[in-house]
A protein has these predicted regions:
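Sec-dependent N-terminal signal peptides
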Residues: 4-13
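A solvent-exposed, acidic/Ser-Thr-rich amphipathic alpha-helical stretch
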Residues: 53-103
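Short, cysteine-centered beta-strand-loop-beta hairpins and adjacent loop/turn segments enriched
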Residues: 88-89, 116-125
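Positively charged n-region of N-terminal signal peptides that target proteins for export
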Residues: 1-4, 17-18
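Short, low-complexity N-terminal intrinsically disordered segments enriched in polar/charged residues
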Residues: 16-50, 54, 58
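Short, surface-exposed coil-to-beta transition loops
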Residues: 94-96, 124-130
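Short beta-strand edge/turn micro-motifs at domain boundaries
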Residues: 127-151
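A short hydrophobic beta-strand element
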Residues: 106-114
């Protein structure tokens, strides 16, 4: 009987230690993923599209209202091209991060406001929420949600 109690105590202690290690590992990963998401916005606001694109895997998956929320794979070259085109339309575009919410092991949700000047010289402010999936230090998915019907 003593052996069984001792075994159960050891098993319980071992499983608690594993859970604690897993929690620490998840927190470290979450913190690193938050840094990557925040770094993306630094490069965005500097209009350094190549550095921004380098935060993604070779062919990450994107979803956004402008594509009808249909998943699309894009190369880094496509990302750079699309953001350069956007910059030519909105040369002063900037994103202001409102909040960053880590979610689980590999997701980071970023709430932000995109601001700039339309080609007709009117100002716009567009609230956006993006869910980033980050694996092995690179963004694999970028799902953005916004309503630009008022802009």
């Amino acid at each position: 009987m003593k052996k069984i109690v001792l075994f159960l105590a050891m098993a319980s202690l071992f499983s608690c230690k594993q859970s604690e290690e897993k929690m620490i590992s998840t927190k470290e990963t979450s913190s690193e993923n938050e840094k990557i998401a925040k770094e993306l916005f630094v490069h965005f606001n500097k209009h350094d599209w190549q550095k921004m694109a380098n935060l993604y895997t070779e062919n990450p998956e994107f979803k956004e209202p402008t594509s009808g929320m249909k998943p699309q794979l894009k190369s880094r070259a496509q990302i750079v091209k699309e953001y350069r085109e956007m910059q030519s339309m909105f040369p002063d575009v900037q994103n202001s991060v409102v909040a960053v919410y880590p979610s689980g092991k590999n997701k980071v949700i970023v709430e932000f406001v995109s601001k700039g000047t339309n080609p007709d010289k009117t100002k716009f402010e567009l609230p956006i929420c993006t869910i980033f999936t980050i694996e092995n230090g690179k963004i694999t998915k970028d799902f953005s949600y916004f309503d630009n019907s008022q802009n």
